[in-house]
C-alpha cells in the first residue's frame, strides 16, 4: 500500500521505541490512538513487517497486537540508523533495589 514516508517513519519509530503496538480493527478510524497517523496505515505497515518476519501478530477481541522480533529489532535499527546500544522499551528492565528489613537486636 502506498503511504507517505513520514507516516511510515512515525510507525517504525514508535514500534522500535515501545517494542509493541496495539491497533483496533477499524480501517475507517481517522487516527490511531497513539501514533499521529491513520489507523489503516498502522495496520498495513505492520502487516508488511509481519510478512517479512520482523513482527509477530496476535488478534483478539477486534484488536491487533504486534510484537517486535529479534530480526525486527535489527531491521529497524538499520532502517532508522540507530546505534547498537539503543533498544526497544520491552527489552529494558527496571531495577528496583530491594531493601532488607532492619534487624532489631
UniProtKB/Swiss-Prot annotation:
Family in the record: Belongs to the eukaryotic ribosomal protein eS10 family.
Annotated Gene3D superfamilies: Winged helix-like DNA-binding domain superfamily/Winged helix DNA-binding domain
Gene label: RPS10A
Assembly and oligomerization: Component of the small ribosomal subunit (SSU). Mature yeast ribosomes consist of a small (40S) and a large (60S) subunit. The 40S small subunit contains 1 molecule of ribosomal RNA (18S rRNA) and 33 different proteins (encoded by 57 genes). The large 60S subunit contains 3 rRNA molecules (25S, 5.8S and 5S rRNA) and 46 different proteins (encoded by 81 genes). eS10 interacts with GCN1 (via middle region); this interaction is direct and promotes GCN2 kinase activity.
Described purpose of this protein according to its UniProt entry: Component of the ribosome, a large ribonucleoprotein complex responsible for the synthesis of proteins in the cell. The small ribosomal subunit (SSU) binds messenger RNAs (mRNAs) and translates the encoded message by selecting cognate aminoacyl-transfer RNA (tRNA) molecules. The large subunit (LSU) contains the ribosomal catalytic site termed the peptidyl transferase center (PTC), which catalyzes the formation of peptide bonds, thereby polymerizing the amino acids delivered by tRNAs into a polypeptide chain.
Taxonomic lineage from the root: Eukaryota, Fungi, Dikarya, Ascomycota, Saccharomycotina
Superkingdom field: Eukaryota
GO cellular component: cytosol; cytosolic small ribosomal subunit
Protein's UniProt name: Small ribosomal subunit protein eS10A
One GO-annotated biological process of the protein: positive regulation of protein kinase activity
InterPro entries: Plectin_eS10_N, Ribosomal_eS10, WH-like_DNA-bd_sf, WH_DNA-bd_sf
Pfam families with a match to the protein in the record: S10_plectin (PF03501)
UniProt PTM: The N-terminus is not modified.
Keywords, comma-separated and alphabetical: Cytoplasm, Ribonucleoprotein, Ribosomal protein
Other comments on record: Present with 54100 molecules/cell in log phase SD medium. There are 2 genes for eS10 in yeast.
Keyword Cytoplasm assigned: yes
Provenance organism: Saccharomyces cerevisiae (strain ATCC 204508 / S288c) (Baker's yeast)
Main subcellular localisation: cytoplasm
Location within or outside the cell: Cytoplasm
Listed GO MF terms: RNA binding; structural constituent of ribosome
Keyword check for Cytoplasm: yes
Amino acid at each position: 500500500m502506498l503511504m507517505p514516508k513520514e507516516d511510515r517513519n512515525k510507525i517504525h519509530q514508535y514500534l522500535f521505541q515501545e517494542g509493541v503496538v496495539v491497533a483496533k480493527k477499524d480501517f475507517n478510524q481517522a487516527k490511531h490512538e497513539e501514533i499521529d497517523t491513520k489507523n489503516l496505515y498502522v495496520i498495513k505497515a505492520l502487516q508488511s513487517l509481519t510478512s517479512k518476519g520482523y513482527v509477530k501478530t496476535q488478534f483478539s477481541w477486534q484488536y491487533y497486537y504486534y510484537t517486535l522480533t529479534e530480526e525486527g529489532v535489527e531491521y529497524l535499527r538499520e532502517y532508522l540508523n540507530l546505534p547498537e546500544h539503543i533498544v526497544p522499551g520491552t527489552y529494558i528492565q527496571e531495577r528496583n533495589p530491594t531493601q532488607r528489613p532492619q534487624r532489631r537486636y
